[in-house]
């Protein structure tokens, strides 16, 4: 295949740099790019009452049980800065997407000194599921079929080894007020600065 017809898998980030999604490097990863992109990407494919960003979701996730893996919780969706926020039902239809997502997550882990597979840690997943419940309750239109979804989420908690009883009144996320993108970006960067500095102090 000639160079002219070779399929490219590069994306350009807000900093102007190009990243090869098939061969990303730790040096390609900038926290500013991640914060900018996630602050402009909508959760739930944009079906919330108001715009609600992945960046805000991540910041709030990092505040749940913050003594455990807070930096990992903040960065658990960082891959979406490069491949977008594909909703879970669609991800399940395309195994290749998860493979690419995991590869990029591994590079992000290298860039910030995290364990490979950090985004799959049960504690990180638990915080993500708690935020999912809070967000669905606060930001999505109620539907009689919600009970089916709640049951599925509770089953996920049990599969991860956690109790079904969730401390929703203790996580500091209600009422959930969506932030503007510029506010979400700054909050993400501030939280990263706090957590990344703390992580290096422990090493």
Question: Which residues does each PLM region occupy?
Answer:
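Metal-dependent phosphohydrolase cores
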Residues: 1-203
């Amino acid at each position: 295949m000639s160079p002219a017809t070779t399929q490219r898998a590069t994306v350009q980030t807000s900093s102007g740099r190009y990243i090869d999604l098939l061969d990303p490097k730790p040096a390609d990863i900038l926290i500013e790019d991640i914060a900018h992109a996630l602050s402009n990407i909508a959760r739930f494919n944009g079906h919330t009452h108001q715009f609600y960003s992945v960046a805000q979701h991540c910041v709030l996730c990092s505040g749940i049980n913050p003594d455990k893996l807070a930096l990992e919780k903040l960065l658990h969706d960082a891959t979406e800065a490069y491949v977008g926020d594909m909703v879970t039902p669609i991800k399940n239809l395309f195994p290749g997407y998860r493979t690419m997502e995991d590869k990029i997550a591994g590079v992000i882990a290298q860039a910030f000194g995290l364990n490979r597979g950090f985004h799959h840690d049960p504690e990180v997943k638990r915080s993500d599921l708690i935020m999912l419940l809070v967000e669905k309750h606060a930001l999505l239109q109620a539907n009689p079929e919600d009970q089916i979804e709640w049951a599925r989420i509770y089953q996920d908690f049990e599969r991860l080894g956690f109790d079904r009883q969730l401390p929703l009144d203790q996580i500091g996320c209600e009422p959930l007020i969506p932030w503007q993108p510029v506010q979400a970006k700054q909050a993400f960067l501030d939280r990263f600065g706090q957590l990344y500095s703390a992580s290096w102090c422990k090493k």
